[in-house]
Swiss-Prot record:
Further information: During catalysis, the active site Cys acts as a nucleophile attacking the alpha-carbonyl group of tRNA-bound glutamate with the formation of a thioester intermediate between enzyme and glutamate, and the concomitant release of tRNA(Glu). The thioester intermediate is finally reduced by direct hydride transfer from NADPH, to form the product GSA.
Cysteine disulfide links: none
Residue numbers annotated as active site: C50
Disordered: region residues: 427-448
Enzymatic class: oxidoreductase
Entry's transmembrane regions: none
Domain characteristics, as noted in the entry: Possesses an unusual extended V-shaped dimeric structure with each monomer consisting of three distinct domains arranged along a curved 'spinal' alpha-helix. The N-terminal catalytic domain specifically recognizes the glutamate moiety of the substrate. The second domain is the NADPH-binding domain, and the third C-terminal domain is responsible for dimerization.
Task performed by this protein: Catalyzes the NADPH-dependent reduction of glutamyl-tRNA(Glu) to glutamate 1-semialdehyde (GSA).
Alphabetical UniProt keywords: NADP, Oxidoreductase, Porphyrin biosynthesis
Organism: Exiguobacterium sp. (strain ATCC BAA-1283 / AT1b)
The protein's name in its UniProt record: Glutamyl-tRNA reductase
Gene3D superfamilies referenced in this protein's UniProt entry, alphabetically: Glutamyl-tRNA reductase, N-terminal domain, NAD(P)-binding Rossmann-like Domain
Gene: hemA
Pfam family, any one: Shikimate_DH
Catalytic activity from the UniProt record: (S)-4-amino-5-oxopentanoate + tRNA(Glu) + NADP(+) = L-glutamyl-tRNA(Glu) + NADPH + H(+)
Length: 448
C-alpha cells in the first residue's frame, strides 16, 4: 500500500487558481466518499482551507492512484487536467508522510508554528473517519500526526514568539506592564490591522479597550466584537488622557497624533508612563513625542526587529520539530511495512496455539490426577515457552518485510513453517492497471 497526497497550496498556486478548488462544508463528505470509490483508492481524507486543498489517499498502485486522484479533481470541479496540473504538488511514500506531519505541526504554514492548521487537520480526519473513508493506514497516520503536532508545540517554544507586527505590539505592551487587565488601552484605526490588534489585546486579557477611527461606525463595529468603546478620532485628546497604552495603525498620509497632543496630555497626566506603539506606514505619531517625559515610543522598525528575531527563533524551534518528524516517519514506516505480514504472524501464532492446546489436551488425558491449579500452572508455562520460541521468527518476518527481497524471504518463511497463507503472485506495484478493480475488493477488506 502507498500513501499519496495530491494538492495545491499558497506556495504552488495563486489564489485565483486555489479558489477554484475549494470544497464547501456541505460537499466535502460526498467528495471524500466519491474519491474513495475511485480505482485503486482505498482510503481518503480531504483537507480544504483558505491556503490549501489537499487530497490524501491510500492506493495499491502509485501510477493509478495519482492518475485517478487528479481525474477526480478534474471531474469534481469540471475542469481539464491540463488546466491545473502545473499547479499541483504530488508527494508519495515518505515525502507524503513528512508533508502531513509538517502541515499538522504548522511548519508548512505562512506563519511558521501557527496552530490553527492542527484543528483543521483534526476536523478533516474526524469527518473522514466518521463517514468511513479512512481505514487501518490513515487511522494510524492521522492520529500520529495530531499527537506529534501537539507534542511539538508543548515541547518547544515555536508558538510563543510573536511573528506579526500587531502581535509583536501586544507582546511589547505585556513586557512593559505584565498584566493588561487593569490597563486603559487605546487602538487608533479600525482597518484590518486595527481589528487584529484589538483581537490580540483582547486575547491577552485587556478588558478596557477604546477604538478610535475617522469613521466612528467602523470603530463601533470593531469595538463591539471585543466589548470595547468606540470614538471618533477627533476625540483622541481625551483618549490620551486616560490611556496607559496606545497602538496606532491608520492609513493616514500624515501624523494623526502630534507632539502638542501628547505634550498637553502628559502635562495633565503628571507625566504618568504612556506606551505609544506606532505600527503605521507612514507613521501616525510624531516621532518627536519620544522626547517627552514618561513617553515610551516604538515604531514599526522597532517591532520588525522583534518579529525578525522571533522568526529566527521559530526557525531554530522548527529544526527541533523536524527531528521529531524524522523519528515519527521512521516509526510509522516500520509499522507500515509490517502491516502486510500481520496475517502471517497471526497464522504462526494460531498454529502455535493449536500445538499448545493439543499438547495440553494430551497431558490432561494421560495425567488425569492433575488439579485445576496444576493445569493452570502448566498452561501458563507452556504459553511462556511458545511466546519465547515465537519471538525470533516474528522479529525475522517483520525485518524481512522491509528488505528489497521481501517476497522471497516471506515465501521461504511460509514454506519453512508450513503456514496456510497465500502470497500474491507478483508485487502490487507490478499489477497491470486493468487488474486493479478485481484486486480491490479483497485488499479493501484487509485495509478495513
Amino acid at each position: 500500500m502507498h500513501i499519496v497526497v495530491v494538492g495545491l497550496n499558497n506556495k504552488t498556486a495563486p489564489v485565483a487558481i486555489r479558489e477554484q478548488f475549494s470544497f464547501g462544508e456541505q460537499e466535502i463528505v460526498d467528495a471524500m466518499i466519491a474519491l474513495r470509490e475511485e480505482k485503486s483508492i482505498f482510503e481518503s481524507v480531504i483537507l480544504s482551507t483558505c491556503n490549501r486543498t489537499e487530497l490524501y489517499v491510500v492506493t495499491d498502485q502509485l501510477h493509478t492512484g495519482r492518475y485517478y486522484t487528479k481525474r477526480f479533481l478534474a471531474n469534481w470541479f469540471n475542469l481539464e487536467m491540463e488546466q491545473f496540473t502545473p499547479y499541483l504538488s504530488i508527494r508519495e511514500g515518505e515525502e507524503a508522510i513528512r508533508h502531513l506531519f509538517r502541515v499538522t505541526s504548522g511548519l508548512d504554514s505562512m506563519i511558521i508554528g501557527e496552530t490553527q492548521i492542527l484543528g483543521q487537520v483534526k476536523t478533516s480526519f474526524f469527518r473522514a473517519q466518521e463517514h468511513g473513508t479512512t481505514g487501518t493506514v490513515f487511522n494510524k497516520l492521522f492520529k500520529e500526526a495530531v499527537t506529534l503536532a501537539k507534542r511539538a508545540h508543548t515541547d518547544t517554544q515555536i508558538g510563543e514568539m510573536s511573528v506579526s507586527v500587531s502581535s509583536a505590539a501586544v507582546t511589547l505592551a505585556q513586557e512593559m506592564y505584565q498584566q493588561l487587565e487593569d490597563k486603559q488601552v487605546v487602538v487608533v484605526g479600525a482597518g484590518e490591522t486595527g481589528e487584529l490588534t484589538t483581537l490580540n489585546l483582547f486575547e491577552a486579557g485587556a478588558k478596557q479597550i477604546a477604538v478610535f477611527n475617522r469613521t466612528e461606525s467602523k470603530a463601533k463595529a470593531v469595538a463591539d466584537k471585543f466589548k470595547g468603546r468606540a470614538h471618533s478620532i477627533r476625540e483622541i485628546a481625551c483618549g490620551l488622557l486616560d490611556a496607559d497604552i496606545l497602538i496606532s495603525s491608520t492609513g493616514a498620509k500624515e501624523a494623526v497624533i502630534g507632539y502638542d497632543d501628547v505634550a498637553a496630555a502628559q502635562l495633565l497626566r503628571r507625566e504618568r508612563p504612556l506606551l505609544l506603539i506606532d505600527i503605521a506606514v507612514p507613521r501616525d505619531i510624531d516621532p518627536a513625542v519620544a522626547t517627552l517625559p514618561g513617553v515610551h515610543l516604538f515604531d514599526v522598525d522597532d517591532l520588525n526587529g522583534i518579529v525578525n528575531k522571533n522568526l529566527e527563533a521559530r526557525l531554530v524551534e522548527a529544526e527541533k520539530i523536524e527531528m521529531k518528524i524524522d523519528e515519527a516517519i521512521q516509526e510509522f514506516q516500520t509499522w507500515l511495512v509490517t502491516l502486510g505480514v500481520v496475517p502471517i504472524m497471526n497464522e504462526l501464532r494460531a498454529r502455535a496455539l493449536d500445538i499448545q492446546e493439543d499438547t495440553m489436551t494430551s497431558l490432561e488425558r494421560k495425567l488425569d490426577h492433575l488439579s485445576a491449579r496444576d493445569k493452570k500452572v502448566i498452561g501458563k508455562h507452556m504459553k511462556s515457552i511458545i511466546n519465547q520460541m515465537l519471538r525470533d521468527p516474528i522479529d525475522y518476518i517483520k525485518d524481512a518485510a522491509a528488505q528489497p527481497d521481501a517476497n522471497v524471504r516471506i515465501a521461504q518463511f511460509i514454506e519453512t513453517f508450513g503456514l496456510d497463507v497465500e502470497l500474491p503472485e507478483q508485487p502490487v506495484d507490478e499489477v497491470e492497471e486493468t487488474d486493479a478493480t478485481s484486486a480491490k475488493a479483497p485488499l479493501r477488506a484487509l485495509m478495513r
